[in-house]
């Protein structure tokens, strides 16, 4: 559709137009000078996004262009043309699935990025309906893949993608395998005979991190973000594969509802948006019911939006803003819709988490397992309030697959606590001066030849005494997720290594404090605190020690599983691969990795040395302060304010109980924090005892292990 030369021109023109603000357009002549170029670049980016699914600018940059065009057309309506991008919604349809017409159009939302936009929206709504104070329902804006669900006579009959808003793709078989979509629901209790519900398919952030952790360990590139992972999963041709992806569906709008006589129920029997979401919640749908707040007036709306922007990273799902809807559905017809969006709703978008920038150079880093990772140094760019100046390029295959070169313009994404990621190279912006990336043949740290094991995508340094590996292993051992040694962070570890104080993990427990106190930046107090933290780490539960050993593929969850099934860490040297595979969370690859680690004499020697230095390698009575939770199984859901979920789980286990990640009839308690997930509903359905956070704190407050007391806020 576009030649390479034309694409290059449009990208260059995009950069120029992004510098233009609506205040710069003062006359009709100013508008006429840019409006066709503006439409051309928006059409081009629509094509890249919706047809190729391969955008070259961020959503924020696109919205800047789109809003500029809308502003010009609103001020000079005589310049509007029937084919303007503002007059239609682009399509993402392919021929892979049958097409189906929605019962009600699935329009986009108008976007706002500041308080002024929200106040202007409120002004228009108030003027249109003649009411001084409007009641709004405000809820999180999920960053997933849009779907519509149709139920007839209480039965699920169809699921579809958004498509062009009028026609979508029928993906019913794939939707049926998503466990949070009820296959039947008693809508008839509310007089509803046929209903269409709009929703979003998502992947929980923790699940997404697990998927990416596994992919990285296998040498595969991580998925860019939960949204792309969810959208890609929905379009798989095999529903059995879809079922494996851990997808969840949230519903957030009833777009069509009629009784058995065909009478419309929206705006009369279903009068308020908040109440309609409550109905869906009570019928077993996953919805933002507990997150929705009904706000009187725009000031309350703005406060709630800002509150969520501050806590967005604590929410279990990726959200990119808030949706503000007029709560009274009976006003919707009076407010109307445009060809693009309803006038009764608007999205408040959080700060952008994508941006384009240039690769300056590439360096190669060696990790604790010897994996050599290429890291691109970037022209610094702000993404979501954080300045990003480097990004991992994963491995050689990732570089080749995306054809990444030094000097390239790249689209970077940083979502929540997900590490920055190269979404794509803007090849259309290339000038011919870009240089291919040459992967080294020798370790950049120790000079040993690099090897690429069969079946892996990662080049490795196999010299276990490689300085870079040693330092990274020590950093990991002392980290928060492992032995949690405060004051022994990355900077101090690197300094101590350079000075010869640290050459192995056991060296942590024989640091020369008399020499450290003489270093710049260290005083009597800081050295005493460091010594105390190191001494305290000797009594960590053995699951933390197992984590700290840095066994490949073994994270916190697997380490806890191993610890539950042994008395001493050294016991694992007597386990066979088959024994290990019988444990939950341990498959063939992980079992072999554990087996190999404990059959390496150097590793056994290190564990024995740690034991001689006073590190607890066996379960001792001291590890369980009191067995008040003996025989009890706890499951945690939602965000706790008293402590992290990991600390809560550790307290339960130190008190003799078991912390599980799933709810069953054998579960003793489900502890519910803020924004609980599906585990809460499952507990209710199974009759499992529910504890709120206050009840849980009451149970543990007099029994918290000493070394965890400063991590719990009572």
UniProtKB/Swiss-Prot annotation:
BRCT domain sequence ranges: 624-713
Task of the protein: DNA ligase that catalyzes the formation of phosphodiester linkages between 5'-phosphoryl and 3'-hydroxyl groups in double-stranded DNA using NAD as a coenzyme and as the energy source for the reaction. It is essential for DNA replication and repair of damaged DNA.
Listed GO CC annotations: cytosol
Protein name: DNA ligase
The entry's keywords: DNA damage, DNA repair, DNA replication, Ligase, Magnesium, Manganese, Metal-binding, NAD, Zinc
SUPFAM superfamilies: BRCT domain, DNA ligase/mRNA capping enzyme, catalytic domain, Nucleic acid-binding proteins, RuvA domain 2-like
Binding site for NAD(+): 59-63, 108-109, 139, 162, 200, 325, 349
Highest taxon, organism lineage: Bacteria
Record field: catalytic activity: NAD(+) + (deoxyribonucleotide)n-3'-hydroxyl + 5'-phospho-(deoxyribonucleotide)m = (deoxyribonucleotide)n+m + AMP + beta-nicotinamide D-nucleotide
Gene Ontology BP, a term: DNA repair
PANTHER family attached to this UniProt entry: CHROMOSOME TRANSMISSION FIDELITY FACTOR 18, DNA LIGASE
Annotated signal peptide: none
Obligatory cofactor(s): Mg(2+); Mn(2+)
Stated family: Belongs to the NAD-dependent DNA ligase family. LigA subfamily.
SMART domains documented for this protein: BRCT (SM00292), HhH1 (SM00278), LIGANc (SM00532)
Active site: 141 (n6-amp-lysine intermediate)
Cited CDD domains: BRCT_DNA_ligase_like, LIGANc
Cross-referenced InterPro entries: BRCT_dom (IPR001357), BRCT_dom_sf (IPR036420), DisA/LigA_HHH (IPR041663), DNA_ligase (IPR001679), DNA_ligase_AS (IPR018239), DNA_ligase_CS (IPR033136), DNAligase_adenylation (IPR013839), DNAligase_N (IPR013840)
Entry's EC annotation: 6.5.1.2
GO molecular function: DNA binding; DNA ligase (NAD+) activity; metal ion binding
């Amino acid at each position: 559709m576009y030649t390479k030369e034309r694409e290059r021109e449009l990208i260059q023109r995009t950069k120029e137009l992004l510098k233009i603000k609506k205040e710069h357009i003062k006359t009709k002549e100013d508008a006429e000078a840019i409006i066709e170029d503006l439409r051309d670049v928006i059409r081009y980016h629509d094509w890249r996004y919706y047809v190729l699914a391969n955008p070259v600018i961020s959503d924020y940059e696109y919205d800047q262009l789109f809003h500029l065009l809308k502003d010009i057309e609103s001020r000079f309506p005589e310049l509007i043309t029937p084919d303007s991008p503002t007059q239609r919604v682009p399509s993402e349809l392919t021929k892979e699935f049958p097409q189906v017409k929605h019962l009600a159009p699935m329009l986009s939302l108008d976007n706002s990025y500041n308080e002024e936009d929200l106040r202007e929206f409120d002004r228009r709504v108030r003027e249109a309906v003649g009411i001084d104070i409007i009641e709004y329902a405000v809820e999180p804006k999920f960053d997933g893949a849009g779907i519509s669900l149709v139920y007839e006579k209480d039965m699920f009959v169809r699921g579809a993608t958004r498509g062009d808003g009028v026609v979508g793709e029928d993906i019913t078989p794939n939707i049926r395998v998503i466990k949070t979509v009820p296959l039947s629901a008693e809508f008839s209790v509310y007089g509803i005979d046929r209903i269409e519900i709009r929703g979003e398919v998502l992947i929980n952030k923790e699940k997404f991190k697990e998927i990416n952790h596994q992919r990285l360990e296998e040498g595969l590139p991580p998925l860019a973000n939960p949204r792309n992972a969810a959208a890609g999963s929905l379009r798989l041709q095999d529903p059995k594969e879809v079922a494996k992806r851990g997808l969840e569906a949230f519903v957030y709008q009833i777009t069509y509802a009629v009784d058995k006589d065909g009478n419309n129920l929206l705006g009369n029997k279903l009068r308020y948006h908040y109440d309609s979401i409550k109905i869906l919640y009570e019928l077993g749908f996953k919805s933002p019911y507990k997150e929705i707040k009904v706000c009187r007036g725009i000031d309350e709306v703005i406060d709630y939006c800002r509150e969520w922007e501050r806590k967005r990273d604590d929410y279990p799902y990726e959200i990119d803003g808030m949706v503000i809807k007029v709560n009274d559905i009976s006003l919707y017809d009076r407010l109307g819709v445009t060809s693009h969006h309803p006038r009764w709703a608007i999205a408040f978008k959080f700060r952008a988490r994508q941006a384009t920038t240039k690769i300056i150079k590439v360096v190669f880093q060696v990790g604790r397992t010897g994996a050599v990772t290429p890291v691109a140094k970037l022209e610094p760019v702000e993404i979501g309030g954080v300045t990003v100046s480097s990004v991992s390029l994963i491995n050689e295959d990732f570089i080749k697959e995306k054809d990444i070169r030094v000097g390239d313009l790249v689209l970077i994404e940083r979502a929540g606590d997900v590490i920055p990621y190269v979404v794509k190279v803007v090849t259309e912006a290339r000038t011919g001066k870009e240089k291919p990336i040459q992967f080294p043949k020798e370790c950049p740290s120790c000079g040993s030849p690099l090897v690429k094991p069969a079946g892996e995508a990662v080049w490795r340094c196999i010299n276990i005494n490689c300085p870079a590996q040693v330092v990274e292993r020590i950093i990991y051992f002392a980290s928060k997720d492992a032995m949690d040694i405060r004051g022994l962070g990355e900077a101090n570890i690197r300094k101590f290594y350079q000075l010869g104080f640290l050459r192995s993990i056991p060296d942590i427990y024989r640091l020369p404090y008399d020499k450290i106190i003489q270093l710049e930046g260290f005083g009597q107090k800081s050295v005493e605190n460091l010594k105390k933290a190191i001494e305290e780490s000797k009594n960590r539960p053995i699951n933390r020690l197992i984590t700290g050993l840095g066994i490949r593929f073994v994270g916190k969850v697997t380490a806890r599983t191993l610890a539950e099934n042994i008395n001493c860490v050294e016991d694992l040297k007597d386990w066979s691969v088959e024994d290990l595979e019988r444990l939950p969370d341990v498959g063939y690859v992980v079992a072999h990795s554990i087996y190999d680690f404990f059959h390496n004499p150097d590793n056994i020697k290190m564990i024995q040395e740690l034991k001689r230095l006073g590190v607890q390698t066996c379960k001792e009575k001291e590890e369980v302060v009191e067995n008040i939770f003996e025989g009890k199984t706890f499951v945690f859901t939602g965000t706790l304010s008293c402590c992290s979920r990991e600390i809560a789980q550790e307290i339960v286990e130190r008190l003799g109980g078991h912390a599980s990640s799933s709810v069953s009839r054998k579960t003793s308690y489900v502890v519910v924090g803020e924004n609980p997930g599906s585990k809460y509903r499952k507990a209710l359905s199974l009759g499992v005892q529910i504890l709120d956070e206050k009840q849980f704190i009451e149970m543990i407050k007099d029994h918290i292990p000493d070394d965890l007391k400063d991590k719990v806020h009572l």
